[in-house]
Amino acid sequence: MIRAFFGRVLLALAVLFAAVPAAAHQQKLAISTVSINPRTDRVEIVHQVPLHDAEHALRHGGVHSPDIVSSPESREAFADYVTTRFPVRIGDQFAKLTFVGSEVKGGSLWVYQEMPVPEPSQTVSINSQILTEVWARQENRVNLGGGTAVRTLIFRVGDGFKEAGLRR
């Protein structure tokens, strides 16, 4: 009886530890930075998404074998996906974000976008829903500004637009 008990405990531990590496690849966190570049007078938007999460999102969207590290097509597909999941509004109009590029650095895919700086009187609102349709516990952080004046907005599944308050 004791042997059977320890056998079950060992089996349960083996199953638990086997699941940990699979879960470790899913970080469920995307970080975006939105700041004004005074040299170019453009709003720069940078998204950092863990590679495994980005590839999982592409598989979820129907891409059979995504390979973000070595496939420009996979990187472009994820960049297209990001543009649909990160809308920006200026007043009541959707802003046109320009895709600048993407690259793999470390364990993340970085996607770069930009747009013109809105007038100071205009309200800028953001809604980051990157990966929220893939994982219910996804959290997206949007850092606004730069230097020592950074403000962070946190988005989860189902959240609406939040005012960004960009400052020159």
Predicted regions and their residues:
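N-terminal secretory signal peptides that target proteins for export/translocation
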Residues: 1-6
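Bacterial N-terminal signal peptides
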Residues: 8-19
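N-terminal soluble domains immediately following signal/targeting peptides that reside
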Residues: 24-168
